[in-house]
Amino acid sequence: MKKVLLLLAVALLSLATSFKAQAIEDPNPKGTFVLGAQVGFLPGVGASVFGDYVLVDKWWKGHFTVGGELFFRHYGRTYAELDGYSYKYSYNDFAFAARATYGLNITSKFEVHAGVVTGVGFSRWGWKNVEGNHSHESQVGVCYGGLAGVRYFFTPSFGVTAEVQYSGYGPYTNVGVVFKM
């Protein structure tokens, strides 16, 4: 009996979700361009600017986008040892990446999205101790990873966004604004 009730509840929920999703007009038709700016945290602080172009719309209650992103991150730390010896280190990362996302339209104003990023990243790090010794190094590498986030639009062309992203070079958590053109 419990299995039958659970099956019935799941069927009704999926039917209600299907009817609600069909009633939502696609807020991101093909050809829409979304421009965003974000501030990032963890680790350190950073910023990113991205652009997404809607390539395919009305696909399984959502849309596919392709675009690009520039991001920067800085973080550092000071360590003090028990014997009084201390040192500082810092990292600066910059990357340019292509991104592709799938956005699921929950309502006409609210979207959940996930995607992938890949590109090239540049890092510079260094350390310095109290005696004046220091070292700096740089590297160039491939960045790749994934992202997941949400967007909420207050008007048809302005909204806010939050993303969790890992690419090896940029901030992991981002919040910002988006403009739909």
Residue ranges and their predicted role:
Residues 1-29:
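Cleavable N-terminal export/targeting peptides
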Residues 24-107:
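Glycine- and aromatic-enriched membrane insertion/assembly motifs of diderm outer-membrane
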Residues 26-33, 128-129, 151-158, 181:
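Flexible, solvent-exposed coil segments and beta strand-coil junctions
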Residues 33-37, 62-68, 96, 112-118, ...:
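Transmembrane beta-strands of outer-membrane beta-barrel proteins
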Residues 36, 82-88, 130-136, 161-163:
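Extracellular loop and loop/strand-boundary signature of outer-membrane beta-barrel proteins
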Residues 58-61, 108-110, 152-160:
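Repeated loop/turn-to-beta-strand initiation elements of outer-membrane beta-barrel proteins
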Residues 104-105, 109-128, 137:
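Mid-chain, well-packed structural core segment of small domains
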Residues 170-181:
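Outer-membrane beta-barrel "beta-signal"
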